[in-house]
Amino acid sequence: MEQEWLQVRKKLQRSLSKGQYDLWVSTLEFLGIEDGNLILGCQNRFHIEWLREKLEAKLLPIASQHFRGVRKLEYRVAQGCAAGAPEIEGAGPRQIAFSDVVKCVGPAFNPRFTFDHFVVGGCNQFAYAAAMGMANNQQLYNQSVYLLSDTGLGKSHLTHAVGNYLRNRKPELRVQYVTTEQFANEMIFSLKNGNMEAFKNKFRTGCDVLLLEKIEFLSGKEKIQKELVYTLDELMDRGKTVLCTGNAYPKDIPKLNSELQSRLGGGLLAPIDKPDFKTRIEIIKRKSHTENIRVPMEVVEYLADRITGDVRQLESCLVGLMAKSNILRTPITLDLAREVSQTMLDQLPKISVEQIQKIICANFRITLEELRSTSRRKQVALARKIGIYLSREYTTESLQSIGKSFQRSHSSVLYAVNEVQKGMGEANGRLKREVEYLSRRLETSCLSES
């Protein structure tokens, strides 16, 4: 059976990066098969949790091909691994603890997502204040708040923070927390079972605070949108509070009817931007403090400079660093940080100028020939300008290379980039919204193709 396990590992090696394989698979031990369960020896509990969450969906089908009758995977902390490893001199990294899921009546809010655990910076200060003000019932603005940002920047954290705050401070309030997908599924189920009154009671008369995430899911779902409009109207009429989240301004979400756009856009709109360098440093320091692990300042600054995407990427890189340090029983150093961050960056989808041009043309409904032409038509000129800017932001191509792709001179490319950068400085300007919307489309498209 050792040969079969070797074949499983070889297949995994072909589908994973070298860093992922070395860290998570090469350290696995084949312990045998019991009652249809493939028993694997792991380094520690963190190793087990990572395998369950990230690799099991890929590992189980491969194992079933090579081990007849295997239906499940079972993980055990192998003897002599974490417990018996020699101690490193000095303060070594501790085992990463996983909080148990809090069992409670009503919506399940992540206990880690609180206002105290939210790192506030210039990128999210307004959204934080809006969510906190709503939780405190400060009547400084409309009773509706809409948080918008790209994925991984803190919308869900703030939404759960409101829920946790209300549950602890105002338990008498009836709080409903759902994603729009859950809202839609409950509505469809109620329709099929002739129980729409119960559905309406839950979200209208039986609700004091509605927390509704991922509005973009409703794109094109006309009947669900109409029901949500009725729900929002009744809640507003009764003086109740609503917090919604989305990945774009309501009016920029495609196939969202004008009534719903109006209801959502009529409240307080609170965008969240990507964290700046200073905020990224604070996020890393807060996360390492929460995990009770000491990370040298030079490593903190290196990660903050290297990982410039969303908060989730930053925390994921830090967790990977702590995991590797923990599993290998080695201190956290700058060299280890370089290795882990490079492994993570290698996994991110690469975006090309051609992909950017394709999305730009589709959005502005122009041809590639028009985009590259000398046309000064307003629509074409705007598309070209944004395309050049996004190429500068998302690729490693030089200005000269970008100019060649758009059939423009170096100075024309530089002018276009500067023009868009000026427009991005306007808080609610049309150009800024257009660029943010196309950036989201570009990132989503590349992630789905990777």
From Swiss-Prot:
Region (Domain III, AAA+ region): 108-325
Quaternary structure note: Oligomerizes as a right-handed, spiral filament on DNA at oriC.
Superkingdom, natural source: Bacteria
SMART domains cross-referenced by the UniProt entry: Bac_DnaA_C
Entry text on domains: Domain I is involved in oligomerization and binding regulators, domain II is flexibile and of varying length in different bacteria, domain III forms the AAA+ region, while domain IV binds dsDNA.
Classification via HAMAP family: DnaA_bact
Source organism of the structure: Syntrophobacter fumaroxidans (strain DSM 10017 / MPOB)
GO CC, alphabetical: cytoplasm; plasma membrane
GO BP annotation list: DNA replication initiation; regulation of DNA replication
S-S pairs: none
NCBIfam families: DnaA
Domain IV, binds dsDNA: annotated segments: 326-450
Stated role: Plays an essential role in the initiation and regulation of chromosomal replication. ATP-DnaA binds to the origin of replication (oriC) to initiate formation of the DNA replication initiation complex once per cell cycle. Binds the DnaA box (a 9 base pair repeat at the origin) and separates the double-stranded (ds)DNA. Forms a right-handed helical filament on oriC DNA; dsDNA binds to the exterior of the filament while single-stranded (ss)DNA is stabiized in the filament's interior.
Keywords, alphabetical: ATP-binding, Cytoplasm, DNA replication, DNA-binding, Lipid-binding, Nucleotide-binding
Annotated region described as Domain II, given as residue ranges: 70-107
Region (Domain I, interacts with DnaA modulators): 1-70
GN (gene name): dnaA
Subcellular location: Cytoplasm
Pfam families per record: Bac_DnaA, Bac_DnaA_C, DnaA_N
Molecular-function GO term, any one: DNA replication origin binding
Family matches, as InterPro entries: Chromosome_initiator_DnaA, Chromosome_initiator_DnaA-like, DnaA_C, DnaA_dom, DnaA_N_dom, DnaA_N_sf, P-loop_NTPase, Trp_repressor/repl_initiator
Stated name of the protein: Chromosomal replication initiator protein DnaA
Family: Belongs to the DnaA family.
Residues annotated for ATP binding in this entry: 152, 154-156
